[in-house]
Amino acid sequence: MFWDRAALVYDYFERAYNGKVYRATGKAVAEEIAPDDHVLECACGTGAISVCVAPLCAKLIATDFSNGMLKQTAKKVKRFTNVEVVRADITKLDFADSTFDKVIAGNVIHLLDNPQAVVKELVRVCKPNGKVVVPTYINKKNSKSAKMAALLGKAGAGFKRQFDMESYQRFFSEVGYRNVAYRLVEGIMPCAIAVISVDNQSIQTI
């Protein structure tokens, strides 16, 4: 698997190429977390967001499909007693409905064949009045970041689509979510963060 191979060098690449955004995204996501929260993180990667969230919540379950990525996350969070690192498939989560106060899925929906179904799965496991937080790198057409994404795709990253801010917002609207807040972390490869407030309307889209 590409991501198992990439796990050992992923942090080095991110810090060298897009370090400002890489660091700021974790901090921005952490602002959505409350002390009593039970949090599910999908596609945790090497744990860049996990280490920002863990000290702020009651419980964090960090998941990924790549064993290589999970090993890197486990190293980063080993000092925390409230974190569990688990292999999981984001397309079919083995958790009951309305389990978590917050659900996070960072930089993954552009890799998926059916991201619409996955967003609904994230909402399914989130409690009413909870939040689903979805950070995703975005690119302007013909920008340096778009060209870099294309190169990574050729290397095996498996990008299925690229978003700009407008198409990112449109994606959530077309899935059926209206109560969504957005913020943008600026940098070489910017990161758009969508925060879905899980209300009755959100649940009805599942």
Give residue ranges: language-model regions.
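Class I SAM-dependent methyltransferase SAM/SAH-binding core
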Residues: 40-92
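C-terminal lobe and adjacent flexible extensions of AdoMet/dcAdoMet transferase-like proteins
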Residues: 194-206
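C-terminal alpha-helical "lid/dimerization" subdomain adjacent to the S-adenosyl-L-methionine
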Residues: 13-16, 133-193
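A short acidic, Gly/Pro-enriched loop at the edge of an enzyme's catalytic core
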Residues: 91-103
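A short SAM/SAH-binding and catalytic strip from SAM-dependent methyltransferases
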Residues: 102-114
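Glycine-centered, small-residue-biased loops immediately flanking beta-strands
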Residues: 37, 130
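A short glycine-rich, Lys/Arg-flanked "PGG" loop and its adjoining helix->strand segment in the class I
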Residues: 116-128
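Conserved class I S-adenosyl-L-methionine
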Residues: 1-34, 48, 72, 76, ...
